[in-house]
């Protein structure tokens, strides 16, 4: 599932088409382009150019030169492709075509991505890679749900998925079942530093799957730091691995 690093890679793809005039739009997939009717996005975007790109957590959007904003979400398995041949089996769910040739496509085999005009991100928490110290303390250090579930809540901070949550907690030496409102300030600050470091490393190395813990998230896996057998459970509805010796 795409997490913040994959979304940042997609934003950089989107950046490649800034300044190119849109001459055609394929918005026929009524599920991916909901709530827009077929042709509505095309009518709003044709003749405009993307002028800037942004990301908050897993959510992407682009400004246009006088037209509406364009919001994109990769869903569970989507990606953005630029100037590639059309995908087989109609997996290109939303497509922009540009003057002089070339195309941007939301490619999504599972059809869980989104394309929408003028997206509303008021329900989305601050970007996990950029949230400040005081705001992180106030948002994450609340509530009694397991700490991992708190990190996964996109209204609290945005961009942390299942793999990154395990990696962040392992780096911070905090157990996934810890109660957020019982963490002290030093623990919350350590968690924020671990979050930012894990995000930076994952963006640099190419995705959430590159974390130190991730290759060991298997049955029988051992902690790469102390070699203790990892524990495995479902926490917050997600499969979770952690070190019972390091993560307290």
Model-identified regions with their sequence ranges:
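Structured catalytic/nucleic-acid-binding cores of DNA maintenance enzymes
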Residues: 1-248
């Amino acid at each position: 599932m795409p997490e913040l690093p994959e979304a940042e890679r997609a934003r950089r793809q989107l950046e490649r088409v800034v300044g190119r005039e849109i001459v055609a739009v394929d918005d026929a997939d009524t599920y991916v382009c909901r709530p827009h009717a077929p042709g509505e996005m095309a009518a709003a975007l044709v003749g405009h150019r993307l002028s800037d790109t942004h990301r908050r957590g897993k959510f992407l959007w682009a400004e246009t030169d006088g037209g509406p904003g364009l919001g994109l979400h990769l869903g569970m398995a989507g990606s953005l492709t630029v100037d590639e041949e059309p995908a087989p089996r109609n997996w290109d769910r939303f497509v922009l075509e540009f003057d002089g040739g070339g195309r941007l496509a939301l490619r999504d085999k599972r059809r869980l991505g989104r394309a929408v005009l003028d997206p509303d991100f008021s329900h989305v928490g601050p970007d996990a890679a950029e949230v400040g110290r005081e705001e992180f303390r106030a948002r994450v250090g609340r509530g009694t749900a397991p700490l991992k579930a708190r990190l996964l809540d996109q209204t609290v901070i945005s961009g942390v998925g299942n793999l990154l949550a395990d990696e962040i907690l392992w780096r911070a030496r905090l157990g996934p079942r810890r109660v957020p409102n019982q963490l002290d300030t030093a623990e919350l600050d350590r968690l924020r530093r671990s979050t930012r470091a894990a995000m930076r490393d994952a963006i640099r190395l190419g995705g959430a799957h590159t974390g130190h813990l991730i290759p060991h998230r298997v049955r029988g896996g051992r902690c790469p730091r102390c070699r203790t057998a990892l524990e495995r459970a479902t926490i917050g509805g997600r499969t979770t691995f952690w070190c019972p010796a390091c993560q307290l």
